[in-house]
C-alpha cells in the first residue's frame, strides 16, 4: 500500500505558531473551554438533540414538549393523536447560499404521528380500536445553528442572547422599612413558578398575614390554608406548640419550665419551684436565658405562677365544661378575667394554652380570628370572587379554578430547578418530578415567613447567583415552541371534532403554520434575538457570551434599581465585573467570565482546583454559586511548593457572603484555577489590566469590540496569551478538519488530502473555500488569507487560514506603533491624537468597508419593471460603467450619484397632444411611457464595485450578465470536483500499480501479452481505463482490485451527483418575494484611510480623536533617526489612572530593542563574526526553557525563528499574573535600554533636543468604527417637515443643523437683529420668502424680504385647538 505520509514536512504546522515570552507564574491545569459552547450546547445538544437516535433521545427540549402536548384527544374521546418520533431533513440551502439569497438557514421538521380511532359502545361505554393510521407530518422549517453559534434569518446573521432571570422557587424578603412610616420591617414571601400564577404572602403593619395571587387583591393567609383543606385546629397545631397549666390548690398554677422560652427581663413575681416550693428569684430581679438554663440543669422542671398569669394567654384547644362537655371557649380564644373566673368556678384542673411569646408571635392566631371564612367552601368562594370578579361563585367552579391555579401540571410548572430550590429552602424532600405546588409547600412557606418575623433565619439575597439563572437559546426557543404547539393543539381538537374522523389522516389535522409563525416571530422580533455584532471576531464572541437581564420575563431598564446592576460577590469567576455597557444598560447586560460554564439547571459554574490535606491537586471541579458557599476557597496566586503543598501559616480564603478569612492550609477546600477566571474574554485581552482603574478597563473592553479590521493585520507585541484562543473559537480563522497534507493553495481555496483513511483505504479530500471580500453585518470586510503552503503537513484543528483581524492564528485588532508621550503645539489637547504622515502613506490603519445596494424589478399594475441600459433622458456619460443589460461592471470606480443598475418603471398614460403624437411617431414609444427608477450611489459613498449578484424568479428568462455569473460559479464547482477526483485517482491508481507490479498477466489490453510479469515501465504506457482491464493469476489481488474499483466508482458517482445537484440549484432560479421578477445586489468597497476626526483607542480605555496629520520631517524623532508615529498627551494619564498603558509602552520599547539585538546577532553570525551558541545563549536568557525544542533544532531553524521576531519580540503578560515592574525593568536592561523607559527625543521642526527625556515605546492602538466619513455631513438642498415646513434634521434625512433656542439667545445678546430675522424666516420656514430669495440669487441680486414663518401659523392653529380664535391682521405699510 502507498504510504500516506509521502513528502511530508517533518514538523506539523502547529510548530509554526507564534511563541511568546510568558510572564505568568501559575501553571494552567484547565484549558479555556470553547468560548461559544454555551450557544451550541444549549441549542443543538439540549433542544434539537441532533444526530441522536430516536430511541436514545432524552426527555428534554423538543422531545419533552412533543411528549407533553401529545397525545391530543377530541372532546368525545373517539380520536387520539399520539407522537411517535421526530427527525430533521437536510436543509435545502447551505449557510452561504442562505446568506446570498436572503433566506433562513433551516431544516424541515418531520414528526411521525399516530392517529387512533376508537369505537365506543354506547350502552356499556367500552372502547375498542377501530383503526390506526401512522404518518410523517411536516411541521415547518426549524432554524439551524451555524458552526459558529449563530442563526441565518432572512439572509442576516443573528445571535440569540442568553437571558438572566430570577430562578423559579420561593423567596423571602422584607421591605427594608420603606413602606411603613415607623420603619417597621414588613416581611413577605413570593413563589415564582417557571410557568403559571405567582403567589405572594405578606405581613401588614398590624402583623396580619395576607396572600395575593398574581398581584390581585389581598386575602387573609388563613383563607388559603383553609382552601387547601386545613381546619382551625390543624392550623393552630401546625404553627404553635402548646403548654399545659395545672391547677395547684391554694398556690396558683403549675407549668413546665422551658428555658428556651425565657428572654432577658425583670420578674414581676417570684420564681418558685412548683415541686419544692423554694423561691429561686425574687420579684424585680433579672432573669436571663443563661440563668434559666442553669436552673433547668439543676433540676427545675415546673414553676408556680399566679392566677393572673393566665390572663392574655390563648387556648390551644376548645375549653369544655367537665360536667356537660359543653364548649365554653373555642380554640385560639384569649383567656380573659371573666373566663378565668368560669374556669375557677367549674374547677377545671388543666388548661392548654399556646406558646406565644417574643420568640413566637401570635400572627397566625390573629389572622385566623380576623378571617371571616370558617370552612373550605367559603374560603374557595372568596378566592374565586377575587380572581373572577363579577362571575357567580359556586363551589364546583371555585374548586376547579383553585386546582388549576397551582396543582395542574398543564397550567402550573415550577420546573425541576424550582422544585430543587423549593425543597432546599423549605427543608422538604419532595420528588423532583413533582413540579406543581403541594400542600406541604404552602404550609411550610407560611411557617418560614413567621419564623423570619420572629427573628429566626435570614432573608434571601435576590442578586445572589444561586437565585438567578440563565435561560440560553435552547430554552428560549423551547418556550416559543410550547406556545406554538399549545395553539396548534386547539386547532387539532377543532378539526377532529369538525370532520369525519374515519377518513382523516394525521396531516389533515395538523396546521404547521401556527408553529412556524411563532418561531419566525421570535427570531425576527424578539428583544433577545439580535443582529450579530460583526465588527470584528472579538465582538462576535462577546455577543454570543452576553447575558441580558432585559427581555420578556426579565427586568425593564426603567425599573431596575442599583442593587440588580451592582457587582455581587457570587459574580466571582462567573460574570465579568468589568465588561458591561456604559449608559442606561449598565449592569443589566453582562458578559460571562472566561472559564465559566452553564450547568443543566441554568446556573453559572466556575472551575476550582481541589485541595486535599493542604496539597493542591490537578483535579478541576466546577461549582455553582450555591455549592461554592459551603467551602473555603483560596486564591490562584497562593504560594505552593514543588510538591503542591500550600505555603505559609495562614491562607487568605473566600467564604460565603463574599467575606475573606485567614485559615490554616489544611482547612482550604479549593483554590482558583487561574486569576484570569474572574474576567471576560475582552477584559482578558488587556495586558496589565491589574494596573488600570476599573472604569477605564470597562471602556477598554468595550472599545476593543469596536475595532475595525485593518488591511494589514498585526498581533500585539505585548499580549496576554489569550489571543490565539479567541481567534480559534471565533470562527474567523479556518481550522483543519482532519490531519492531512496540503495539495493545492491559492488565495481562494485550500485543498488538503486527509490522512484519515476510509474503509477502502482511500483518502478523503477536504476543500476549504475561503471568504474573499465579503460584507459583514457592520459593513466591515471579511477576508481570509491562507497560512499554509503546498506540501505542508497539518494536524486537526491547526489554523490554516487567517480571517479578518487575525494574524498567524492570533487575534489582531490593531497595530503596534511607536508612540511618544509629549505635548505638541496644543494639537493633543483634550485627548486629541497627533499622527505621522507615514501611517497614512503606508496604510498602517487603512481599512476596507463594503456597502450593499439592492434594486428589485417588480411586476406592477401597469406592467413589469425592466432592468435595462435604455433609460430616458440619461446621457451616455452616465451610462459608461453599465454593461449591455444595464448592470454595473465589477471593478468600476463609482462616486455619489452614479448609476449602479438601470431600471425603468411603466407610468400611467395621460392624454397626449398632437405634437407629442408626432414625436412618438418619429422617436418610438419607449421614452414616453416609462420613468427612470435606477439605483444610484447614495451621497457620501464612493468606491470600487467588488461584486454583483443577480437573482431571477423561477420561470423568468435570465439575462446575459446572470448567465455569465452562473457560468463562473459552475466552473468553480467543476474545479472543486475535478481537484478532488484527481487526488483520489492519483491515490487509487498508485495503489493499483503497486498491487499489479510483479504479478503474471492472464488477460489485458492489446499491447500486453498474457504470461508476462508486470513491471512499472509496462504500466506507464497504459491509460487509466486500460489498467482496470488487466487480470492477474493471484485471486486475492483480483479481489482487492475489484473492491478498489467498486469504491472508486461509488466515490466518482457521489462527486458527480453532488456537482449536478448544485448546478441544478444554480440554474433553477430563485425564490423571490411576492411580485419581484429580478433582484440585483451591488457591493461597493471603500478604502478608509486614517484622517483627522477618526476615533482611535488603546486597550486601556485611552481614547481620542485624530487632530492633525503631520509630515514625517516635522515629527519628533529618536537619535537613530526613527520617526515617532504617534504623539499622545501625557496629561491623559494621571487623572484616568490607567497606568497599564505606560507599562505596555515600556515593554513594547523593550520588545523592539530586543528584536534589534537579535537581528544584530543574526547579522554577525551570517558574517561569521560570532558562533550560533551566542544566539542560543541570548535566546535562552530571554525566553527561558520555553523554547528548548527550538534551540535543540538545526541552525536553520534557530535563524528562521530569529527572523520571525526581527520586528519585535512577542510577550504574554496574563491578567493578574503578568509582568511586574521589575520584569519590565529586566527586559529593558536585557535590551540595553535606560531603565526609566525614557529617551532623548529631537524636535523635527527645529532639530533640537527636547528639554527633558520623553517616554517612548511601542503601543498597540486600534482604529474604531466611529469614522469621520460616516459622521460629517452638510445640507445643500433637502426635504422639509410637512407641518412646520422647517428643514429636517440628521444625516439620513439629508438634514440641516438646527439653529436652536440658545443660538437665538447668542444673536439677541449681540443685538444682531437682521441676522436673527434671516435665521428664523427665509433660512428656516418662511416658504414664500425662501422661494423669492432663491429667485433673487438666480438673478444675481442680493436683496430679500422676510415674510411670516410657517411656525407662526402652526402656533395660531394650536391656539384655535384651545378654542381661542386668534387672527393676524396685517396693516399695509404706508
From Swiss-Prot:
The RNAP catalytic core consists of 2 alpha, 1 beta, 1 beta' and 1 omega subunit. When a sigma factor is associated with the core the holoenzyme is formed, which can initiate transcription. Its EC number is 2.7.7.6. It comes from Rickettsia prowazekii (strain Madrid E). DNA-dependent RNA polymerase catalyzes the transcription of DNA into RNA using the four ribonucleoside triphosphates as substrates. Changing residue 15 to L: In strain: Breinl. This is DNA-directed RNA polymerase subunit beta. The lineage of its organism: Bacteria, Pseudomonadati, Pseudomonadota, Alphaproteobacteria, Rickettsiales. Changing residue 19 to L: In strain: Breinl. It is an enzyme of class 2 (transferase). Changing residue 299 to S: In strain: Breinl. GO terms for molecular function: DNA binding; DNA-directed RNA polymerase activity; ribonucleoside binding. Changing residue 282 to N: In strain: Breinl. GO terms for cellular component: DNA-directed RNA polymerase complex. InterPro entries: DNA-dir_RNA_pol_bsu_ext_1_sf, DNA-dir_RNA_pol_bsu_external_1, DNA-dir_RNA_pol_su2, DNA-dir_RNAP_su2_dom, DNA-dir_RNAP_su2_hyb_sf, RNA_pol_bsu_bac, RNA_pol_bsu_CS, RNA_pol_bsu_protrusion. Belongs to the RNA polymerase beta chain family. Keywords: Antibiotic resistance, DNA-directed RNA polymerase, Nucleotidyltransferase, Transcription, Transferase. GO terms for biological process: DNA-templated transcription; response to antibiotic. CDD domains: RNA_pol_B_RPB2. Changing residue 96 to E: In strain: Breinl. It holds the Pfam family RNA_pol_Rpb2_1. Gene3D superfamilies: 2.40.50.100, 2.40.50.150, 3.90.1100.10, DNA-directed RNA polymerase, beta subunit, external 1 domain, DNA-directed RNA polymerase, subunit 2, domain 6, RNA polymerase alpha subunit dimerisation domain, RNA polymerase Rpb2, domain 2. Disulfide bonds: none annotated. It catalyses: RNA(n) + a ribonucleoside 5'-triphosphate = RNA(n+1) + diphosphate. HAMAP family: RNApol_bact_RpoB.
